[in-house]
Amino acid sequence: MAEETPTRSPGGAAVLDKAPERVRKRSPRYKVLLHNDPVNSMEYVMTTLRQVVPQLSEQDAMAVMLEAHNTGVGLVIVCDIEPAEFYCETLKSKGLTSSIEPED
């Protein structure tokens, strides 16, 4: 919240001057991508997605898996760089193909 500082105008009335508000720059966001996987079963991919990214519902995990299956790549989640790297590396450690890229 900006601080207000009273000042006197020439007519004697007090005028409140607001200090400029600070705008926080939003940190860049990254997309975690799942690439099509011809090796693992659809059930394994969905289960792994839900284990690694707890925010995903069963329906979300299925949608990501089907998007990757049908188009070659599915969007798992958009988040800050640290969790994006964690999710990507954890998916890879479980045998899935994943990458991250900056959000547009």
Curated annotation (Swiss-Prot):
One annotated GO biological process: protein catabolic process
Disulfide bonds: none
Pfam families in alphabetical order: ClpS
Residue span of region Disordered: 1-20
Coiled coil stretches, renumbered: none
Chain's role: Involved in the modulation of the specificity of the ClpAP-mediated ATP-dependent protein degradation.
Family the UniProt entry places it in: Belongs to the ClpS family.
Subunit description: Binds to the N-terminal domain of the chaperone ClpA.
Name of the protein in its database record: ATP-dependent Clp protease adapter protein ClpS
Species: Synechococcus sp. (strain CC9902)
